[in-house]
Amino acid sequence: MGLSALLVSDIRALPEPQGVKRASVPGFTSFLCLNENQYVIAVFVAHAVFYFDGIQMTASEEQKSQIKSKERVSERGEVFTAEREVNAMCDLVADECLRPDSRFLEPACGDGNFLSVILQRKLSELKRKYRKSPRDFEKLSILALGSLYGVDIMNDNVLACRERLFRIWDAEYTALCGSNASDEVREAARFIIGRNIINGNALTLMCVDGEGKDTTAPIVFSEWTLIGTTQMQRSDYTMSDLLMCHEEGSLFAPLLEDQKEEGGIFLRRYVTHYKKVHEHS
């Protein structure tokens, strides 16, 4: 899969490709471009724009580990980004990959090549800072999980990505917290991952069924925010409404009251202990 990376100070400075439709998401700002003969997924994070060009589909020896089958490549254009490119691209926004609250969206996440590397970097930084404070590591590692979002049309990819992220988190959590590790926190972690990694179509903004066909349910993202020392707030928004919000800043930027009422952007909100977020399913 061909790819390139471009650093810009403003997403609006990017040239508009001819015949291409763009939708921007403020914050981690991710946008999708589509025309008749190619698809391009561009992820804008902290002034870095990553382009994934879906035209080249030949499977050389180097690319074989990047595909699951020729049929999936032909039917879905499914080609995974190699580890070398993943790390090189993450290095462009290295500081953001260390912040537990810096949000990332991968609108075609596959089994989590990008999200897993970002999570590992976030957890490594938390471990460096809070090695002697298991409680702080526990709380902030949950926040780090809540900062990662992914959408994929293939259900097996979604399940694999969720499990991959959980295992990475659980290994670090268990190693650092030892006997203080809690199954209740593990359940909360699985719940957050399940909410954030969605089986859906990022082009139509709808959830899909087991065959990859659109359902009537829209893709909904949850914003996870720590309040005080132990409370976590979850706020739900539809992806389609987030795409309609053009204010720059955070993905979940504060919205005006009339936007909330007229656009129906905000769906629901819960506040609870970070260990008990799964109780509001």
Stretches found by the model and what they are:
Residues 18, 38-39, 47, 51, ...:
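Low-complexity, intrinsically disordered or signal/transmembrane-proximal segments
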Residues 48-49, 57-281:
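SAM-dependent methyltransferase catalytic region
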Residues 20-21, 28-29:
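N-terminal amphipathic/hydrophobic targeting modules at extreme N-termini
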